[in-house]
Amino acid sequence: AKGEALDIRQGVPFCTPCSVYAGSYEDAKDSDIVIITSGIARKPGQTRLDLAQTNVNIIKSITPNITKYAPDAIYLFVSNPVDILTYTFCKCSGIPESRILGSGTILDTARLRARLSEYYQINQQNVHAYVLGEHGDSSFVPWSVANISNIPANAYQKAMENTDGMLIPPLNYADVEDYMRKSGGNVIRRKGATFYAVSISV
């Protein structure tokens, strides 16, 4: 933690001023927001659910320590499996559910939008599509509400037609969802862990 804090702190001169340091539970005293990232990381070939029991035990062990100093904070969970850990904290912390959040499928949504923007070669900010459900293999995309530049996703391909036919081959929804679900594992296989996209999403 000290090494991470030092690395980030040395980049603060390029950002909005803030204090970054490795601390203790007591340093969270009277915090407005507490972000929980505790837990072991996925290894290549593991699913998020493979981490469940170990990370549930970790959350149960840290909960009394953190809630002691920040009983009025809003808690945001990022650790995997995020849905299970968020639920665990709800049950064992005594904190009102209205102040407990999980990152849910926000990262899955970002990965979906990134893939669609790559496919259609457009700015990601013009892609409006969402992933619902569990942050994991059972997540799904409600394509009926997806749109690209205010054009429904299922009509966007037709909008790209020209006299020579389609500019880009028709999108395979199943392939896109498969890409989205496997993105985390693909990053882990290549570099060992995911850091940047999930950090930005929070």
What are these regions (language model features)?
Residues K2-D30, Q46:
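Conserved N-terminal Rossmann-fold NAD(P) cofactor-binding segment
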